[in-house]
Amino acid sequence: MAMAMAMRRAAALGARHILAASSTSSSGVLLRRHMSVDAGAAMEKVRAAGLLRTQGLIGGKWVDAYDGKTIEVQNPATGETLANVSCMGSKETSDAIASAHSTFYSWSKLTANERSKALRKWHDLIISHKEELALLMTLEQGKPMKEALVEVTYGASFIEYFAEEAKRIYGDIIPPTLSDRRLLVLKQPVGVVGAVTPWNFPLAMITRKVGPALACGCTVVVKPSEFTPLTALAAADLALQAGIPAGAINVVMGNAPEIGDALLQSTQVRKITFTGSTAVGKKLMAGSANTVKKVSLELGGNAPCIVFDDADIDVAIKGSLAAKFRNSGQTCVCANRILVQEGIYEKFASAFIKAVQSLKVGNGLEESTSQGPLINEAAVQKVEKFINDATSKGANIMLGGKRHSLGMSFYEPTVVGNVSNDMLLFREEVFGPVAPLVPFKTEEDAIRMANDTNAGLAAYIFTKSIPRSWRVSEALEYGLVGVNEGIISTEVAPFGGVKQSGLGREGSKYGMDEYLELKYICMGNLN
């Protein structure tokens, strides 16, 4: 019940609203008219490729919701309805779980090489449909097309990587304590996995979970965000085309509370993997306790970006800009607080503002766009709440600070100065295009300020000093640290946080362990 209430609140918060002001402004009307033409052509291209799916996937079959209900998938830039997809609930989820459970035994018995070949084919199909997937992603999520293309490649990289790692799931032989014994450790797939994924990276967050799960021999029930199900469904369609068997991947979307509760209550689901808010992650963790499921959680962040006075300013500007404004600030590893040493604060602020001014806000389908809309009206209202809180406590708006003239859920790239630790911008994740600048005096002050949070996902530091880079990296209470770099995620490195930013790791060889169980075998009386 608590889980259902939490997910209902999250769904209510994320409800899409169309701004009355934008519907009456001439610029808003022109924007929607222009984007409608682009969106129509893009959707037709996706449809022609056979990748526009609106039904759920259960046991290899595309099925409607059992009660016939649907939900709208909207373009966040225009409010237009892109498609109506099946609104599924507990019954459909239970059937998806049953399908995954029955398929698990045959899929897990395949050789690692056989699973690897199927995954490799899936990777190749994703790459061959790179443009269509990117178009779909831009339409339903809003990110610029160039970022969407990068995400397709990034998402596919997990499939490729884990296709190879499938053949490297090694056990152990332990030296015995008695001469007539042999001690072995096997690694075996955990079973059916429930994967709950977010809207900000609608492809990569699926492949980062489903790739290792399938490589290990697990089967999966995916619950994508109701805001971005089309990308997930297209990816699942390509998985079927690649020869991944019916039932190995199932996709259900719609009624988040019902789907979540069905996954948690099922004894056949042996693992939950989730990327999303800390609040919902805590509910999933608590709900998993009743059936003692294995849990992986990649939760919210509050990333500090520390710029020391010995940093290369150009490198720091470029890295901070990338760390902050990618996907319009809607990533869990976004620089949420930019801490700048007092000696270079004014110089950095001036150069940073100039760089932010160069960001082009607009239609994600246009080549020149570098900043798309926020996902919905609720996201804009959250940003406004944080800005109002900061200015009421003494912060000053150095750039932006208001809704964009394009209307809808567009927000101006914003820089806020003199932010202090009593402000929401310092304490919580804004998840929008707002860069708070915070001055600090010493290295010790920077470390203390950076660690003054319950979150611990990503952190960034900019310095020319190698000793300082080691000291600060080791002192920061974060799972990921970028040194003189603002984009650090890769399929070959472990991704995950500490403290209340999550449990477990995704990507890399360490990500495989999240989907495996250890089995110890003692063979006796061998003399």
Swiss-Prot record:
Pfam families: Aldedh (PF00171)
One Gene Ontology MF term: succinate-semialdehyde dehydrogenase (NAD+) activity
Primary subcellular site in the record, as a coarse category: mitochondrion
GO biological process, one term: gamma-aminobutyric acid catabolic process
Binding site for NAD(+): R208, K223, P224, S225, E226, G276, S277, T278, A279, V280, G281
PANTHER family the UniProt entry points to: SUCCINATE-SEMIALDEHYDE DEHYDROGENASE, MITOCHONDRIAL
The protein's name in its UniProt record: Succinate-semialdehyde dehydrogenase, mitochondrial
Organism the protein comes from: Oryza sativa subsp. japonica
Underlying gene: ALDH5F1
